Swiss-Prot record:
Organism: Rattus norvegicus (Rat)
Keyword flag Zinc: yes
Domain notes: The RING domain mediates ubiquitination and the neurite outgrowth inhibitory activity.
InterPro entries linked: Band_41_domain, Ez/rad/moesin-like, FERM/acyl-CoA-bd_prot_sf, FERM_2, FERM_central, FERM_domain, FERM_N, FERM_PH-like_C
Zn finger region (RING-type): 387-422
Reaction catalyzed: S-ubiquitinyl-[E2 ubiquitin-conjugating enzyme]-L-cysteine + [acceptor protein]-L-lysine = [E2 ubiquitin-conjugating enzyme]-L-cysteine + N(6)-ubiquitinyl-[acceptor protein]-L-lysine
Compartments where found: Cytoplasm; Cell membrane
Protein name, as recorded: E3 ubiquitin-protein ligase MYLIP
UniProt feature, compositional bias: Low complexity: 350-363
Gene from which this protein is expressed: Mylip
Amino acid sequence: MLCYVTRPDAVLMEVEVEAKANGEDCLNQVCRRLGIIEVDYFGLQFTGSKGESLWLNLRNRISQQMDGLAPYRLKLRVKFFVEPHLILQEQTRHIFFLHIKESLLAGHLQCSPEQAVELSALLAQTKFGDYNQNTAQYSYEDLCEKELSSSTLNSIVGKHKELEGISQASAEYQVLQIVSAMENYGIEWHAVRDSEGQKLLIGVGPEGISICKEDFSPINRIAYPVVQMATQSGKNVYLTVTKESGNSIVLLFKMISTRAASGLYRAITETHAFYRCDTVTSAVMMQYSRDLKGHLASLFLNENINLGKKYVFDIKRTSKEVYDHARRALYNAGVVDLVSRNDQSPPSSPLKSSDSSMSCSSCEGLSCQQTRVLQEKLRKLKEAMLCMVCCEEEINSTFCPCGHTVCCESCAAQLQSCPVCRSRVEHVQHVYLPTHTSLLNLTVI
């Protein structure tokens, strides 16, 4: 089955997957080609029959979510935005930049005149490099008014000249830094109508839910702690909110389609879980619906049968867990690369495959395969002794009363519940494991 996936820079990728493939299979293949390990930040979008932008559920079959027949057209988009310093890979940072650039030029992110001047200079630097009077001015008008005043143009030129020698990657990072400080950074907007039929925009972001008019002028902001419950019924989404008086109020939002309503419901639940929770709960992970065939099979055959099961949410990790997972993956990739590299060979990318051969003279009687196996065991042993929170210090603390021993002393002191079983921590006991750093630092060869 063929899928056409468009990147934020309008480059089209052809992706071939199995006929029964889930969305995750397609996204993983795209990210693998781009060299991206931090897959959890991204998603695949498509356009519904009524023009609504919808997220593909990565845990369900692609063919069951799309209209028509293959090839299917999808868009690679950033689903969860994080602070630039939390992005570990330059490839990931570049896709973030492309998405942000597209949003800026489309007017989805509002910036002040001062920010527009600075961003115009940075965007020109990423596109053309150092200032050149023959080419740079054509990109200055993208963010500022079409007819630039001489003072505005001079300000942008001055800023651009100050960027001389700045690399494209550095300029892209500075763009992300500026945009991440904006009020609407990381907010996903949904077009709705209220109970009276008035057109509104609902923004779902890291801090809560924003209700705005069509021109983005704010009406109300709802923080996640005061949201009791979000539910969906047909084309409607209901939000139960606690008022300052302590009473509850139910807000009704009407969507253009049932799938659009499902998209808003998913956005509220998944965004809250990603940014505000320590881990994704099983209540979110395991929520699903069944089609008629699957429902009948579950009644007469087995309640746990997977036939006809469609998951409601596809989020697997929170922001903290994504960062930790990516750090471990990059660390592991770097260790494998160091093991497989000859002493005489030049430094290579930390993501380079470990297929390169090791000279037999360095194995000292062991075969190359045996050496790699032993090095892999050593790597796993060293990783197992690291704190699961910071991934830097050795494990030396036990949570009581549950008994899990997975953190260093400094991280354990900051946790109120065990990161493994989620039980409450009454106190932390320092422990002395039968290991020593010097032992783990021994090399096999």
